[in-house]
Amino acid sequence: MTTTTFFLFLIPVLAIILLAVNLIFSPHNPYQEKDSAFECGFHSFLGQNRTQFSISFFIFALLFLLFDLEILLVYPYVVSAYTNGIYGLVIMLVFFLVGTLGFAFELGKNALKIESRQVYNFNYKSWSGYSLIYNK
């Protein structure tokens, strides 16, 4: 059996096995909020779709963009790591260090904490018999 044939048979089988394991072992807690439409991180009440919007969502989007660009800038080094040598490795480590320090600073300032204006009170019995109660 060649490597390509083995690869073409192994990957779908592995994907099906992992999906089956996820389906079997994942928690199932159905409640009404899971079936409702998701609108910008909060629920609209009585048609109030134009309420104030938390800036935290934009901070998350900017962080995603920054770390996505970080991966994009690291990719050329990974492709040519052998020719770059130790100098390129040091530059990449400094690049990662600056990104990590910035992320740690944001975590320290609680910039990634999203404050919700809603109070959840679910007292719902799921099909498995577990009670879901969450008061904020």
From Swiss-Prot:
Q: Where is the protein localized?
A: Mitochondrion membrane
One example GO MF annotation: NADH dehydrogenase (ubiquinone) activity
- One of the record's GO cellular component terms: mitochondrial membrane
Keywords (A to Z) from UniProt: Electron transport, Membrane, Mitochondrion, NAD, Respiratory chain, Translocase, Transmembrane, Transmembrane helix, Transport, Ubiquinone
Reactions the enzyme catalyzes = a ubiquinone + NADH + 5 H(+)(in) = a ubiquinol + NAD(+) + 4 H(+)(out)
The protein's superkingdom reads: Eukaryota
**Enzyme class of the recorded protein, top EC level:** translocase
Protein name, entry field = NADH-ubiquinone oxidoreductase chain 3
| InterPro entries xrefs | NADH_UbQ/plastoQ_OxRdtase_su3 (IPR000440), NDAH_ubi_oxred_su3_sf (IPR038430)
Q: Record keywords: Hydrolase included?
A: no
Q: Name one Pfam family in it.
A: Oxidored_q4
Identify the EC number(s): 7.1.1.2
Q: How does it sit in the membrane?
A: Multi-pass membrane protein
* Gene3D superfamilies assigned to the protein according to its UniProt record, in alphabetical order: NADH:ubiquinone/plastoquinone oxidoreductase, chain 3 (1.20.58.1610)
What protein family does this chain belong to? Belongs to the complex I subunit 3 family.
Q: Does the keyword Membrane apply?
A: yes
